[in-house]
């Protein structure tokens, strides 16, 4: 049994043309018989949400804060890299990883032309602008230390 009515969701595009409007000569395709999809709106595009929900406001307020003001970093030499006298140091959570690299270069007395490669948990080399507190929060070990391996030649990753 063929029906002359199109099934819901299978309507073909038809052109809408307004004879009274001279500017409507270029008609745009319109899908008739289709409901508009329920697309999620961002909070900034929503006309219903005038303010953020309390949970979102609290989460955003705490996003840049850290549980500890300073975090412990444990340095581990890899390969022929010299060992440090103090393998653990405390660094402010808000500092960038560049601060850790500068400290290690200064402590090892590395020339400006020489390279030092740093890896978190012997897996990846973080970007210099990465925040130490974020690295610690995501990759600390069971003793609440961030393990940073260092080498004079590329080792991991």
From Swiss-Prot:
Give a yes or no for keyword Transport in this entry. yes
Top-level lineage group:
Eukaryota
Q: Which residues form the signal peptide?
A: none
Please name the taxonomic classification of the source: Eukaryota, Fungi, Dikarya, Ascomycota, Pezizomycotina
In terms of PANTHER family, this protein maps to: AUTOPHAGY PROTEIN 12, UBIQUITIN-LIKE PROTEIN ATG12
Q: Which family does it belong to?
A: Belongs to the ATG12 family.
Gene encoding the protein: atg12
- Give the UniProt entry's GO cellular component terms: Atg12-Atg5-Atg16 complex; autophagosome membrane; phagophore assembly site membrane
What InterPro entries does its record include? Atg12 (IPR007242), Ubiquitin-like_domsf (IPR029071)
Q: What is this protein called?
A: Ubiquitin-like protein atg12
What species is given as this protein's source? Neurospora crassa (strain ATCC 24698 / 74-OR23-1A / CBS 708.71 / DSM 1257 / FGSC 987)
Crosslink Glycyl lysine isopeptide (Gly-Lys) (interchain with K-263 in ATG5): position given as 157
Q: Name one GO molecular function term.
A: protein tag activity
GO terms for biological process, alphabetical: autophagosome assembly; autophagosome maturation; autophagy of mitochondrion; glycophagy; piecemeal microautophagy of the nucleus; protein transport
Q: How does it assemble?
A: Forms a conjugate with apg-4/atg5.
Tell whether Ion transport is among the UniProt keywords: no
What job does the chain carry out?
Ubiquitin-like protein involved in cytoplasm to vacuole transport (Cvt), autophagy vesicles formation, mitophagy, and nucleophagy. Conjugation with apg-4/atg5 through a ubiquitin-like conjugating system involving also apg-5/atg7 as an E1-like activating enzyme and atg10 as an E2-like conjugating enzyme, is essential for its function. The atg12-apg-4/atg5 conjugate functions as an E3-like enzyme which is required for lipidation of apg-6/atg8 and apg-6/atg8 association to the vesicle membranes.
What are the alphabetically sorted keywords of the record?
Autophagy, Isopeptide bond, Membrane, Protein transport, Transport, Ubl conjugation pathway
Sequence ranges of Polar residues compositional bias:
1-13
This protein's membrane topology, according to the annotation, is: Peripheral membrane protein
